[in-house]
């Protein structure tokens, strides 16, 4: 392609292309067959161009997308422009034949939008809509209950001591100290033990005792649901965190830990709760035996008998605390021991219910579905049972949920589903966040 003598390469197609780049014109709708001209061999397309053609449809190769060597080699100065343009772009062979005199439509690239699960904007939206952390709210609520329980306990005991102090002559009692006797009387009355060593002897004190007993029932429930539950939850969370953070390599220790703590479900096993509660009861019994034997100067058998009667709130009245130190220690011991026994009884009942629920769940999951059960599980009556319907049906059979539990959830779903399409979209959620929704629905 080079000229002789002067070395002028003006006829070199590659040099001409680099000095004066061009963009190939779009090919005609019908390809003309070259007859008198030279036929140029179409150059193969690159894999990237083939991928773009399959994804975005037909396109005209631009100067940036075209390969310089391919366009330069495909240019032949001895041939006519019609033959060159007919086979200049090999990708045009993929185009289907169209009708004559009809312009070729360029298909627009299809853009599909997909939600990114790692998009940080979703976290910002969630923070705006739900700024509070449920765990933080639950901990703050528990602390609030504990503070209220402590305040009510102080008010209850202070009021009882004040009334006893003002009417201390209206009680049949072996007096030691008015404040200690009043505190001892309030604790014994609130715990419903009733030794009979301190009894009211006037109208005012009897009315006060009636009021004090009735209020004491409700107050014991507050203590059980508030302070004791909070302390046990703290202990459970501490043990769970310790079990998660420990790196134990021994299989035997792993088996013991899995037997005591269910790390996967994030809770203590009910057998451990019952064992701890019974252990606390045994400690309370032992502490009571020591108080009665060394302080009240009672024999070991009578001390154990009196301790059991006191912890279980039976209180026959044949024994009682008569010394100042004994009544002062009994005021603290009886409050803790009666709460521990009540909690142990609740854990025992919970273990029985948990065992019954496990047996029922095992039975429900083991049985096959009959035609009548299929019809019951088909909630929307469309002739088929979806996975959600199957799960709801099985949970109902296990007595884990009822219609009263499902209806409020469905009512809240209908409020979020603005378009009644049977599904909640992000647009529906953003629209509903601007309006006040009930945080809880009464069941």
UniProtKB/Swiss-Prot annotation:
Residues 72-98 have a biased composition (Low complexity). Homodimer. The gene is TPK2. Probable voltage-independent potassium-selective tonoplast ion channel. Each of the two pore-forming region (also called P-domain or P-loop) is enclosed by two transmembrane segments (2P/4TM) and contains the GYGD signature motif which seems to be involved in potassium selectivity. One of its GO terms (cellular component) is plant-type vacuole membrane. Residues 67-109 are annotated as: Disordered. Belongs to the two pore domain potassium channel (TC 1.A.1.7) family. It is found in: Vacuole membrane. Signal peptide: none annotated. Expressed in roots, stems, leaves and flowers. Residues 365-400, 404-439 form the EF-hand domain. InterPro entries: 2pore_dom_K_chnl, EF-hand-dom_pair, EF_Hand_1_Ca_BS, K_chnl_dom. Keywords: Calcium, Ion channel, Ion transport, Membrane, Metal-binding, Potassium, Potassium channel, Potassium transport, Repeat, Transmembrane, Transmembrane helix, Transport, Vacuole. This is Two-pore potassium channel 2. Residues 181-200, 302-321 dip into the membrane without crossing it. Ca(2+) 2 binds at residues 417, 421, 423, 428. GO terms for molecular function: metal ion binding; potassium channel activity. The chain crosses the membrane at residues 145-165, 208-228, 275-295, 328-348. Ca(2+) 1 binds at residues 378, 380, 382, 384, 389. It is a multi-pass membrane protein. It comes from Arabidopsis thaliana. Residues 1-144, 229-274, 349-443 are cytoplasmic.
